[in-house]
Amino acid sequence: MKTGIKKVKLHVRKNDEVTVIAGNDKGKSGKVLKVFPQKGRVIVEGVNIRKRHMRPTQGMPQGAIIEREFPIHVSNVKKS
């Protein structure tokens, strides 16, 4: 028996221009960078930016704090 997550048809695609209609970033607009159909989420350029702490590696002996976009739910965006 398979217990997978149902793939949802979304109204936005990669490279679409969208506007955020709900949440902390309401009113911001940007381009869709990535779509996650199984989770119903999208990553929008310049929206929902969070800080990510990276461990020290050979390339970065000090480690780093990187700001990057995180996914938001597709119901919180509309095409613009």
Curated annotation (Swiss-Prot):
GO cellular component: ribonucleoprotein complex; ribosome
InterPro entries: KOW, Rib_uL2_dom2, Ribosomal_uL24, Ribosomal_uL24_CS, Ribosomal_uL24_KOW, Translation_prot_SH3-like_sf
Biological process according to GO: translation
Keyword DNA damage in annotation: no
Alphabetical UniProt keywords: Ribonucleoprotein, Ribosomal protein, RNA-binding, rRNA-binding
Domain of life, source organism: Bacteria
SUPFAM superfamilies: Translation proteins SH3-like domain
Gene Ontology molecular function: any one: structural constituent of ribosome
Subunit structure: Part of the 50S ribosomal subunit.
Family membership: Belongs to the universal ribosomal protein uL24 family.
Function text: One of two assembly initiator proteins, it binds directly to the 5'-end of the 23S rRNA, where it nucleates assembly of the 50S subunit. One of the proteins that surrounds the polypeptide exit tunnel on the outside of the subunit.
Name recorded for this polypeptide: Large ribosomal subunit protein uL24
Species name: Chlorobaculum tepidum (strain ATCC 49652 / DSM 12025 / NBRC 103806 / TLS)
Gene that encodes it: rplX
